[in-house]
């Protein structure tokens, strides 16, 4: 398992010519935050800003030290990626409050936790406002989050499920 922060600044290397095509700046998740949809590599422009990404389908290996890309020509404008309007930037989830279904504050989302195939298995906890099993675990599995919320609304957790499950190591 690896966190989003651990992946920042990892090299993206082309399999075709061994060229470094960029670095992981952040991760775009699919709309349900279950897997990486694209890798954010940078942006340019002030007025007509372009956001550059590599689609997950172009990533061949999600390695420990580098991620391998199928070619050096795989960097595209986010606007040109199908479904990108629903993508969630990983750092946008950091600090988002987590509440129970009844409205009790649990804590805040910390960082993404990914498996070797760039699937989201859970989140670390940033802050915890409760004591007990969840606070000791310092993480929450993705399946325990019923709703990710938004910038203005908290994520909603199934507390019994969160307390009964463990993040893989």
Q: What annotation goes with each model-predicted range?
A:
Residues 1-169:
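Peripheral interaction segments used for macromolecular assembly
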């Amino acid at each position: 398992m690896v966190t989003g922060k651990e992946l920042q600044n990892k090299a993206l290397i082309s399999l075709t010519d061994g060229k470094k095509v960029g670095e992981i700046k952040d991760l775009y998740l699919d709309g349900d935050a279950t897997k990486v949809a694209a890798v954010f590599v940078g942006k340019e422009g002030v007025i007509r800003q372009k956001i550059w990404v590599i689609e997950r389908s172009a990533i061949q290996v999600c390695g420990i030290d580098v991620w391998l890309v199928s070619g050096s020509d795989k960097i595209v404008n986010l606007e040109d990626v199908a479904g990108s309007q629903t993508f969630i930037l990983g750092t946008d989830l950091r600090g988002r409050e987590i509440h129970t279904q009844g409205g009790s504050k649990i804590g805040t989302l910390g960082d993404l936790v990914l498996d070797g195939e760039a699937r989201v298995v859970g989140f670390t906890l940033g802050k915890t406002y409760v004591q007990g099993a969840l606070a000791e675990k310092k993480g929450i599995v993705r399946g325990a989050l019923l709703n990710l919320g938004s910038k203005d609304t908290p994520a909603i957790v199934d507390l019994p499920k969160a307390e009964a499950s463990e993040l893989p190591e």
